[in-house]
């Protein structure tokens, strides 16, 4: 395989498919949850389709019956929905297309572009070992491949055949990859691929080809672990007389340590990020920047991503997952969100903690807390100060801060507060008056106020906290000292 150092511009696909409406697809296998790499691939395919006013297709490749589960399918659909990447068509399920695959297989057998092979797995293994011993690439030797003047072995009576694709022997299969540039494989290096198993079920590479053909897919963006599949799929499409899609292969995502991203680096399941309190807007932004760029722009809306998306700006190099950068992006979106909308997203998380968001002014609470929060979970936890059941300060904390001097100042504050208008400015003025009259510094009243009213020594600005708790609650807690 050879790759060029430079990508030609303009790309071949910009003219080759100029008259074909853009149709992209995302085709996950439901053998597990949608992981970050898959989500990024889906995002690039979705953004490309949206940029070109095209169609984004969702296809579920569920032919691995033993490993595919309904739960995994639902998790994929939930993840796509959460990220706001709803397909224009689909989801389509490969298991519901078996009759179509059988029809195409029969046509290929009749046309001579596929053939039955009766070699046992052990015989094929022996062929490959023999090739290795000669220093050759291990491959099937074409024993059952029909050729003019060739006599095929007798058909074993007790063995069901596989179906192999009759791959071209001469020449090369080349394409101008949308990400990597020109790529070429010698056809002589490619096996006659098995496209149906002995029980008749079609294999992955065959199903993909038929699906892309039937669904009119014009552009395939996928992980670069599929590069070796591409020449095989191109040759099958050519044998079917199909118009080829354009292919682009994006590099993998690496963990912070430079190794392949895995569970040991933290969450890899997309919906775990929802549970941890990340906004889908932030995930879209961050995932897009993992392998794609628009100048120096780090932050952009979904609409800007669609407007700016260009495969020429996809990186050829692997990207590195950075949890701190994700937190920074998420914090940006939290700070910029309307308080009422943010409250709506945080309220269910408060309720799961046993809090009562409806009993407090949650939008105002969000306005107070959001500038220091990185996740919705952090916001929900901090909001429990206002929405949760009051827990008096631990004895040790109370003994440290609720001294006789502090209690006298708190009693003075409470007495004056009864006739004070309850807003942040008035509360701030009241605190300053008590400090001035008693010759105290801010920590000598501010910390005791926090401890007495919230049970904590550290909170956001004390005047803002007291305002949101309400005069009745504040006075009741001070009275209980």
From Swiss-Prot:
Residues 139-148 have a biased composition (Basic and acidic residues). Keywords: Aminoacyl-tRNA synthetase, ATP-binding, Cytoplasm, Ligase, Nucleotide-binding, Protein biosynthesis. A motif ('HIGH' region) lies at residues 28-38. CDD domains: GluRS_core. One of its GO terms (molecular function) is ATP binding. GO terms for biological process: glutamyl-tRNA aminoacylation. One of its GO terms (cellular component) is cytosol. InterPro entries: aa-tRNA-synth_I_cd-bd, aa-tRNA-synth_I_codon-bd_sub2, aa-tRNA-synth_I_CS, aa_tRNA-synth_I_cd-bd_sf, Glu-tRNA-ligase_bac/mito, Glu/Gln-tRNA-synth, Glu/Gln-tRNA-synth_Ib_cat-dom, GluQ/Sye. Residues 139-159 are annotated as: Disordered. PROSITE patterns: AA_TRNA_LIGASE_I. Its EC number is 6.1.1.17. It catalyses: tRNA(Glu) + L-glutamate + ATP = L-glutamyl-tRNA(Glu) + AMP + diphosphate. Monomer. HAMAP family: Glu_tRNA_synth_type1. Catalyzes the attachment of glutamate to tRNA(Glu) in a two-step reaction: glutamate is first activated by ATP to form Glu-AMP and then transferred to the acceptor end of tRNA(Glu). This is Glutamate--tRNA ligase. The lineage of its organism: Bacteria, Pseudomonadati, Pseudomonadota, Betaproteobacteria, Burkholderiales.
